[in-house]
């Protein structure tokens, strides 16, 4: 899935809700080489909210590791008040225009995201850089 831009953040969260996603994996940074790759579609700080017309997304907890950031989110449908927990992984060290020289850390990252996915019995919603 392509990362959302500012005008498509609400649509992104609608897809997350409709697909019953519990895990989001982001392989790029928000900005690379000074260019915005996608809009910051979640709040990076605990207890902050992102509000769209249909959903409220609350950041519950943020864990920073050397190669990734793991953010625990809760999305709530404003109409039904139903909510769901989401784990968001942002990979920090994927090179902008190439493959990593050492893939051991990335293999560990994949294994860890798969453990989380299997725990909630859901597919992963991948977020990659925008395609022009």
UniProtKB/Swiss-Prot annotation:
InterPro entries: Prot-tyrosine_phosphatase-like, Protein-Tyr_Phosphatase, PTP_cat
Coiled coil location: none
UniProt GO MF annotations: protein tyrosine phosphatase activity
Domain Tyrosine-protein phosphatase: 1-132
CDD domains: PTPc (cd00047)
Sequence similarity: Belongs to the protein-tyrosine phosphatase family.
PANTHER family: RECEPTOR-TYPE TYROSINE-PROTEIN PHOSPHATASE (PTHR19134), TYROSINE-PROTEIN PHOSPHATASE DOMAIN-CONTAINING PROTEIN (PTHR19134:SF559)
Protein name, as recorded: Tyrosine phosphatase-like protein N2
Organism: Microplitis demolitor bracovirus (isolate Webb)
């Amino acid at each position: 899935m392509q990362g959302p831009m500012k005008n498509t953040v609400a649509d992104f969260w609608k897809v997350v809700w409709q697909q019953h996603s519990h895990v989001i994996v982001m392989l790029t940074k928000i900005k690379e080489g000074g260019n915005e790759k996608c809009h910051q579609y979640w709040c990076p700080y605990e207890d902050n909210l992102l509000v769209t017309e249909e959903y409220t997304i609350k950041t519950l907890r943020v864990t920073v590791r050397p190669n990734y950031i793991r953010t625990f989110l809760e999305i709530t449908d404003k109409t039904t008040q139903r909510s769901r927990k989401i784990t968001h992984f942002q990979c920090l060290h994927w090179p902008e225009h190439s493959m990593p020289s050492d893939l051991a850390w990335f293999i560990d990252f994949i294994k860890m995201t798969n453990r989380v996915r299997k725990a909630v019995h859901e597919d992963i919603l991948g977020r990659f850089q925008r395609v022009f």
